[in-house]
């Protein structure tokens, strides 16, 4: 999961450096879609990981 977030960060920096002369603004609607998606995916991955781990 951390590798995925690192890749997203690298792509964001790369795209923002390509369009350095233009204003790069994140609108609120896309932000409102991205944050819950990341949180839900983290919860789903965490729940699957808890079910796969052996209980002792």
Swiss-Prot record:
It is an enzyme of class 7 (translocase). Its EC number is 7.1.1.2. One of its GO terms (molecular function) is NADH dehydrogenase (ubiquinone) activity. It is found in: Mitochondrion membrane. It is a multi-pass membrane protein. It catalyses: a ubiquinone + NADH + 5 H(+)(in) = a ubiquinol + NAD(+) + 4 H(+)(out). GO terms for cellular component: mitochondrial membrane. The chain crosses the membrane at residues 1-21, 24-44. Keywords: Electron transport, Membrane, Mitochondrion, NAD, Respiratory chain, Translocase, Transmembrane, Transmembrane helix, Transport, Ubiquinone. The keyword Electron transport applies. It comes from the Eukaryota. Core subunit of the mitochondrial membrane respiratory chain NADH dehydrogenase (Complex I) that is believed to belong to the minimal assembly required for catalysis. Complex I functions in the transfer of electrons from NADH to the respiratory chain. The immediate electron acceptor for the enzyme is believed to be ubiquinone. Belongs to the complex I subunit 6 family. This is NADH-ubiquinone oxidoreductase chain 6.
């Amino acid at each position: 999961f951390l590798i995925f977030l690192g890749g997203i960060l690298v792509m964001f920096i790369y795209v923002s450096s390509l369009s350095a002369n233009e204003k790069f603004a994140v609108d609120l609607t896309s932000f409102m879609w991205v944050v819950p998606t990341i949180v839900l995916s983290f919860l789903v991955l965490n729940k699957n990981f808890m079910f796969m781990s052996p209980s002792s």
